[in-house]
Amino acid sequence: MLDCLSIIERYYTPGNDDYRVLVHHSRQVADLAVALSQRLIGQGVPMDIEFVEEAAMLHDIGMCRTDAPGICCHGTEPYILHGVLGRQMLDSLGLYRHGRVCERHTGTGITAAEIIAQHLPIAPPRDLLPESLEEKVICYADKFFSKSRLNEGPKTMERARKSLAKFGGDTLQRFDEMVALFGTPDSI
């Protein structure tokens, strides 16, 4: 098992607010993603639980390079790039599979067409959609926890859907596909 906190501490200082936000949020996401994965394993679906936990702990590592003061991040890049930046950071450590999770967890994934239509600063435009079950379960679990409201606990299904609705029907369709795959978190 990777020592995820040591990896995080290459980029964040323990005790700082951004570290606290990242580690708290990532632990919430990891716990839910592991529980959902264990449920699938119980149904005979193979899942790499160790990888799910590691990648969930590292999925938002790129946020430190973004300008998102609401979650204690004072970098220079737009927040939408935190996944792409996280992938670059983890790729530089040889953690390519973990880096893919970073790049593909934003929203319910982002298509090249959405990048172009929304004029997102992701170049070159490409599909950044979760593909493996492990990528999808982390993306899905992430939708139930806010980095700006750490102490509120998991969002309800209704609140998770509402937070995604502003991104359009394709985003909600991908979310509904994840609900069908993983079930609802409140049923764990």
PLM region spans:
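Acidic/His-rich, divalent-metal-binding segments that scaffold phosphate/diphosphate chemistry
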Residues: 1-79
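A general alpha-helix detector
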Residues: 7-11, 32, 85-86, 140, ...
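Charge-dense, low-complexity intrinsically disordered segments
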Residues: 16, 20-23, 131, 165-169
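Generic structural signal for well-ordered, non-transmembrane alpha-helical segments
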Residues: 27, 31, 96, 180-183
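Alpha-helical scaffold segments in carbohydrate-active enzymes
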Residues: 32-35, 143, 177, 181
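Charged/polar positions within long, soluble alpha-helices
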Residues: 38, 146-149, 187
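Divalent metal-dependent catalytic cores for phosphoryl transfer on phosphate-bearing substrates
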Residues: 45-157
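Charged phosphate-binding loop/patch that engages nucleotide di/tri-phosphates or the phosphate backbone
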Residues: 163-188
